[in-house]
Amino acid sequence: MRLVILTLVLGLVVLTIGAELLVRSASKLAVAAGISPLVVGLTVVAIGTSAPELVVSVQSTWRGQPDVAMGNVVGSNIFNVLLILGISALIIPLRVSQQLIRFDVPLMIGLSALVWGFAWDGRLGRIDGALLVTGLVGYLTLAVWKSRKEQAAVNAEYESEYGATSTISIGGMVLNLLLLVVGLALLVLGARWFVDAAIVLARQLGMSELVIGLTIVAAGTSLPEVATSILAAIRGERDIAVGNVVGSNLFNIMGVLGLSGLVSAQGVTVTDTALQLDIPVMVAVAFACLPIFFTGHLIARWEGVLFLAYYGAYTAYLVTAATVPQFNRTYEFVMLTFVIPPTAITLAVAVVRDARKPAASRTDSESSEM
């Protein structure tokens, strides 16, 4: 057991280092090649934070472990919203931009529901994967087109994170190429160790590969998003903390699940449990973002606590279902009777009250939260 846990942790460390090397070297090479920091930020850097999910899911599907791939994406999306935004909102109430409310969050809801529909026949096939990847290309193209007017701000943000955008020497290019190759190799190696250890751990604990994917693998591969969002909240960059999570979830659905569906002739199989519980939870979590984001365009601290409580409840259900199945009925009854309805009523009242506020008082309320 100790060796398995050590391999799991080591694989995660190698995976994270590989992702960091890949993002930094690819970003500098892209800028040196004349690609604008705006495009780099929307593609290389954004995709880089989800590189662990991508490599783990594609590799798992390729090696005949689709439950890990599906569990990783679904679990990561649930983890990103409930845990990462929950912790970030506890640090400081998070600002939500109009762009997210009007476009990105509805898109996240629609894509989550679309995946549920695709999975209804028990698998995510190559056609489904191709449609999702095509959607990602369209989304990135639209994002680049819409963000060109913010070019100066994006350049400044890129330079503060990755350094000046000046040209680099031949030696610098060779070094970054080597770092790119090393980063990619570490990603693949770390993913192999991480997935292998997770599978062994699941069997030793008597849990399914799906549950391990939804919990340990999902949490581990989401570490770049954890670091980015929490650091942004601490620095007071509250819109970045929210945008990072929503953007990561969109890429997980379109990019990670899409490519996972493409690499296997059989596609990504979807278990009845995932179809009846975990994917609906992902859809519900995405949908819950809309009323919470809408109220004052802020995620308040009490809403952060609510997110954390629900993630704890969901994780507890997964663990009890795998280890003490006789408690499932009681747990479901308590959640459906005493927890979910009061929460839904509270959110509905908050939305109605916020909608009835005059614009001036709403602005004052936002200022008092800051």
Annotate each language-model stretch with its function.
Residues 1-370:
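Hydrophobic alpha-helical segments, chiefly the membrane-spanning helices
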